[in-house]
Amino acid sequence: MLPSAMYPELLADLVTDLPHAVRLQRLVSMLRTHFRCGAVALLRLEEDHLRPVAVDGLVRDALGRRFAVGLHPRLAAILARRGVTCFHHDSMLPDPYDGLIDEHVGEPLPVHDCMGTSLAVDGQPWGALTLDALAIGTFDAAAQAELQRLTVIVEAAIRTTRLEGEIRALQLARGTPEADEGTAQHGDIGGEIIGQSEAIANLLHELEVVADTDLPVLLLGETGVGKELFAHRLHRQSRRRAQPLVHVNCAALPESLAESELFGHARGAFSGATGERPGRFEAADGGTLFLDEVGELPLAIQAKLLRTLQNGEIQRLGSDRPRRVNVRVIAATNRNLREHVRDGSFRADLYHRLSVYPIPIPPLRERGNDVLLLAGRFLELNRARLGLRSLRLSGGAQDALRSYRWPGNVRELEHVISRAALRAVSRGAGRNDIVTLEPELLDLDGLEVPAAHHAGAGMASAFAAPALAAGITLRDAVEQTQRACIEQALKDQGGNWAQAARQLGIDASNLHKLARRLGCK
């Protein structure tokens, strides 16, 4: 039987108003203490994978991992039946947490005993609870019976959390102040947005507030912060969620085709226009149009976009007939649009239309331990991709990730983890090994050096300040430097534009566009 003190504590949490992350974390912590095991995890079933929502005893990146059920036979077996499933030390099935027990950081010790139970809420499958131990024989028949009795309390805690979330959502929709406290602290890692830092929690709360309006939103953030993911979240939480979200990468639109792509064209509008074609605005009618890299739009297109935002009408290229559209616009940029307004490359009136509700997205370096959760996600993806038994970070590697500045943000982190995993395999790591990534495999020290210093001696001179003629403007000086950098990168890469773009740290489409503007092609 459970100690008499544990039941009241578990039941008290069910009737106490707690942020859901706190409630579920307290639950798994109490279970781990009582069963005297190495780790406890509460996992939510989402389509074909399990997402950890609360863990105790696993490495810090565990909350960022996603466990594909089809690749983890123990998890599949737990989900396949109601009741407790136990795997003893002699089980031949691989454990998803091999090498991930936090008590032994840096020690690739396999799990010996494991038990778990599937969970259901309101009659529907919800996920699983798993308990793991390094000591053989931890989960005997008495422990399994105890977990069976506890399952109903775990399911009740999950149901309470769900109901409280629904209540808070209703309060938020009605503008009730009480909704703020619980919502801002949730540390939600739902969908593809992973993070529990204060910065990301505040951002998710702000998105939730503005999502239910039809205000234009301008997402501001550095390259690689995931602006598209936040745009998708805004749309999913809006009243337009059942209608399409249409994504337009403005930087990839050829200037000659931008108007046709956005607004459509009539038959005969230009050579090759053999029929009517609706544009992206019409495709998004009733829903949301996401204008990514909006700062790259040509001035002529900016004027037509402004008219559409003002009047709710579009006019196809080659047609005199206006068409009404009902579209919410979400725009995103990594540029300082105010500076572009000042230098005349972006319309002030369009800027004010788009930035009715500007939302800055924090860079990865300002998100604290979120870097480890995100790393966990990429570790699990690479583990599955490379067919490894386990892939984890050493303590030193975790410290290195936290201290690095991440100029390329989440995208750069993904590339760093993928490269490190491949290096480990190339150095002899086998499929049955528990692979631990050390700092030298991450090679973050080399990434700290600006591209100008490791692209060759010629590149260093390309980044040197240009000699300024009398009366030259700052803009002319900047363009002169950009032109020199592009020319040197192309020379270093033998004329390969894609490799030159990687050397310069920008998208290839942006490089082509910049080169055309500067007269380099």
From Swiss-Prot:
Pathway: Nitrogen metabolism; nitrate reduction (denitrification) [regulation]
CDD domains reported in the protein's UniProt record: AAA (cd00009)
InterPro entries: AAA+_ATPase, GAF, GAF-like_dom_sf, Homeodomain-like_sf, HTH_Fis, P-loop_NTPase, Sigma_54_int, Sigma_54_int_dom_ATP-bd_1
GO molecular function, one term: ATP hydrolysis activity
Induction data: By anaerobic growth in the presence of NO.
Keywords: ATP-binding, DNA-binding, Nucleotide-binding, Phosphoprotein, Transcription, Transcription regulation, Two-component regulatory system
DNA-binding region: 497-516
Binding site for ATP: 221-228, 293-302
Ranges for domain Sigma-54 factor interaction: 193-422
Domain of life: Bacteria
Transmembrane residue ranges: none
Disulfide partners: none
Pfam families attached to this UniProt entry: GAF, HTH_8, Sigma54_activat
4-aspartylphosphate carried by residues: 56
GO biological process: denitrification pathway; phosphorelay signal transduction system; regulation of DNA-templated transcription
Function, as annotated: Required for the nitric oxide (NO) induced expression of NO reductase. Not required for expression of 2 other pathway members, nitrate reductase (nirS) and nitrous oxide reductase (nosZ).
Note from the entry: There are two very similar, functionally redundant regulators in this bacterium, NorR1 and NorR2.
PANTHER family, alphabetized: ANAEROBIC NITRIC OXIDE REDUCTASE TRANSCRIPTION REGULATOR NORR, TRANSCRIPTIONAL REGULATORY PROTEIN
UniProt cross-references to NCBIfam families, sorted A to Z: PRK05022.1
Protein name, as recorded: Nitric oxide reductase transcription regulator NorR2
The encoding gene: norR2
